[in-house]
Structures are given as C-alpha cells and as structure tokens.
Regions:
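C-terminal accessory nucleic-acid interaction domains of nucleic acid-metabolism proteins
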Residues: 4-12, 73-74, 153-234
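Flexible loop/turn segments at secondary-structure boundaries
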Residues: 126-127, 180
C-alpha cells in the first residue's frame, strides 16, 4: 500500500488536508493543502529534509489552524499503541513488543467483531485505522470514537485513550521514517490493508459514549435552605 493509496483511504474528499513536518530540533510546521497529490509533494519534500512526517486525521474548514473547532469531517477511527521500553519513565509502554501488540489487537477484533483494520508499523509502535466508505461530520464521529476508547478499556486492549478520541490528532505517514533515534531511523510501513466499511456498520459494533455534561445547579427551596442553614444574604 503506497502513501497516496493510504491517504486516499483515510482522508475525506472535502475540506483542507494538513501535513506536518518535525525537524531535528522538534520544531513542528503544519502545511495545509487541498489535494492529495499536493500532499504527496509535501511529504516527499519533508522526507528529503530528514524530517518526521505526520498527517492530520481530520479535514479542516479553513487552512488556518489544526484545532477541533476548525475540523470538518472524519473518515477513520484509529488507535495508537506504544511498544517497547520508555527509557525516560523507566517502564514498559503499552506492550513490550510490536508482535505482542498485534496479538492483542487480533484478540480484540475477534472479540468485538470489528473488521481487520489497516495496520501501520510506526517504528516505535502500532497505528490501527478503521476506514469508512463515506466521511462523517465531526459531531457524529466523536461519540463513536469515545465508544471505541471505552471498548478498548472493557476488553483490555492497551492503547492511548487520549489519542483515540482526539479530533485534532496527528499520526505518522506510511512510507516515511521515524527519526526519534536519528542514528537508527525506522521505516513507517503498512503491515495490513484493511477494507473500508460503512460507518453505520462500524457504529453498531461500538457502544456510543456521550461525554457527561455538568448538570445544571438546581435552586434550593426554602425548606432545604432552612435545613442547611443557608442564609441568602451571604
């Protein structure tokens, strides 16, 4: 699966796309474009400059900022599974190895009956994508993404929950390099090409989760005020 084919699978047809490069000083620069062909040109230029290359999962209304309020549509659900040993935190990440993560992912899809996802080896972990046959509005996508996060927790699949439901998330572009260790860059490659599924079919397999909103504060009646010693003059 080539880079262009991957982007065609995961990006909606409408809106602005965003590709980002991160240089060796960790400076991240976003580039908004309005075609996949132009995105490929940007990816190749960043790769030739020895930069880490990312794509924004959403499309955007305006080519201005990569924030939730500016997001337009989604065409994927995703998971970010970290693997290996975190030398800074001195502990193992989600899984010790990528093979262990893939075994856990297979068990998860078997149990939940979710289709086999498109799987990307990010160099240091595993990225999973469930593409839709059609894009959906961000308001429709959000509760299903939250549901996927809770489904992972329910069945014990370790993944970055904050990433799963983050409308403005960026992830690595396949066909590029992971330069976290500049001396030993690792390839970002597609391990499995999943099939696009109608959004409604995926949503039926995922318990919808609506983020709880704070309840409106009810005014106290006079009897309750008296019991609590509530003095309205305070």
């Amino acid at each position: 699966m080539q880079t262009k084919e991957f982007l065609q699978q995961v990006w909606p047809d409408q809106g602005y796309y965003c590709v980002l490069g991160k240089d060796q000083q960790n400076v991240v620069v976003p580039k908004f474009i309005n075609s996949i062909d132009e995105a490929i040109e940007v990816v190749n230029k960043l790769l030739s400059d020895t930069q880490d290359v990312y794509f924004a999962c959403s499309t955007y209304v305006e080519p201005t900022e990569r924030k939730k309020i500016n997001a337009k549509e989604q065409r994927i659900l995703w998971l970010d599974i970290d693997c290996g040993f975190d030398t800074k935190k001195r502990k193992w990440k989600d899984y010790e190895t990528k093979d262990a993560a893939l075994v856990a992912l297979r068990s998860f899809t078997d149990t939940t009956q979710l289709p086999a996802p498109t799987i990307v080896d990010s160099g240091k972990g595993i990225h999973c994508y469930w593409p839709f046959t059609e894009p959906v509005d961000k308001a429709i996508w959000q509760p299903v993404a939250e549901g996927l996060k809770f489904l992972c927790a329910k069945h014990g699949l370790k993944a970055d929950g904050a990433c799963t439901a983050d409308m403005a998330r960026i992830l690595r572009v396949p066909g590029t390099k992971n330069y976290k260790d500049v001396a030993k860059p690792e390839d970002v490659t597609v391990l499995n090409q999943g099939t696009s599924t109608p959004f409604d079919e995926l949503a039926r397999l995922i318990p919808i989760h609506l983020t709880d909103k704070p309840k409106a504060k009810r005014p106290l009646d006079e009897a309750t005020k008296a019991i609590l010693g509530n003095n309205s003059s305070k």
